Amino acid sequence: MLLDQLVHHAPQFRVPLLKAAFLFLLVGYGTKMGLAPLHTWLPDAHSESPSMISALLSGAVLNCAFLAILRALQVCAAAGQAQFCQKLFVWFGLMSMAVAAVFVLGQTDYKRMLAYSSVEHIGILAFGIGIGGAATFGVMLHAINHSLTKAALFFVAGNILAAYKTKSTAQVRGIFHVLPASGLLWVGGFFAITGSPPFGPFLSEFTILKATLDQGHGAVAIAYIALLALMFIGMATIVLRMAQGRPSSEVKTIQPREAVLAIMPPALLAAAVLVLGIYIPPFINTALHDAAQTLGGL
């Protein structure tokens, strides 16, 4: 059946069977999108895949699974079971953020660090959908911001791996000296992905936070902020150490050259994220509002 037909006939569905179906879909697609505790494949896949594939996984594949779950939410909402689904989204979202924050602390592989960051941001998307209302617009915007930012970071991670020949955070020092352009994008991408102004993720994460507070969910909002802060601290410890310090003599001897084609893709993505933090083009704004209204937000 087409989705429109499912939505039309949803009030006639048996509620216990509908809830069971949604749970199965949440487990299946939740695994594909990396929701904790179904996320275990994601760090392994990201750390072992070529950087371009990792960028595609985080930027597109995870979002596709998320959109599939949103389609299931539409059917449940039409049957009057939106609140049941939203509670699950909130708890799975916070769990994903918590798991990501814990595993990022002391992480020794910078590509796995980025993978756990994806788990966190998938959790943010789920959390925002669970809150609903104006947060739904923030979720739609955040899906774009995360895709652009994470793709840029994985491209830069590929440049770092090509120069240093290792994924170990302990063996990568002095990126600013060895790869100046990549170092700038690496640190800038870190601030963007952790929701620092003036980048796009700050705007979308703040929109979700404001909607949470406006609906009177103070305790949940505090947990949301605390987990964001913990993730910032964990990633800052790794990223800033990699960017600063003195590179090893072996890397100095090699003196890797930064090709224009290796810098332009992440630079363009980073520029787009910066623009979205300052100004949302009307066509994107309209599309996001329409998507949010379709899901019952705004």
Regions found by a protein language model. Give the residues of each.
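Hydrophobic transmembrane alpha-helices and their helix-loop junctions in integral membrane proteins
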Residues: 1-206, 210-241
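Cytoplasmic/organellar membrane-interface segments at the starts of transmembrane helices
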Residues: 49, 179-181, 232-298
